[in-house]
Amino acid sequence: GGAMLWMTAFHFCFDLSHLGYWPQDFRADPVWTGQRTAIVSLFLFCAGLGQAVALQQGQGWARFGRRWAQIAGCALLVSAGSWFMFPHSFIYFGVLHGMAVMLLLARGSAGWGRWLWLAGGVALLLPWGAQWALSGPLADWAVYFNARWLNWLGLVSRKPYTEDYVPLLPWLGVLWW
């Protein structure tokens, strides 16, 4: 419940700024970027816990599929709505898009047991290694990984210009842990 209240307050402040009532730099100010990171982390960590509990209680694929379809459908609505509001920075892989993909991967990797701790650690660290490599020795590859068709993986040398960006990596690591 606390994450929902925090997200609501955050978005209220974002809306005030977007409408010009309270100018803030939500893209660069550490006060806002830190809160965004914490809120997304809480949501994904709780989603991972929820998946673990659901599997422990024997949740079948049919129920999972219905819940997943709701999340994926809402992600599509977010993309459509943001395209009208922010045509140059619409949301094509935000928190709901990421959660839809991550929930499928979490469901498929549920039998990994303790290996999920290692996989989660790798998922958390891999983007930093990719950023270093794509900014240095593998810079020629950056154009591909930074493109929209691959940047949803999170292996980028620079973040894309979009209103919300929650790539698969490192966030899958948060959901797995």
PLM regions: where:
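Alpha-helical transmembrane segments and their immediate juxtamembrane cytosolic regions
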Residues: 1-177
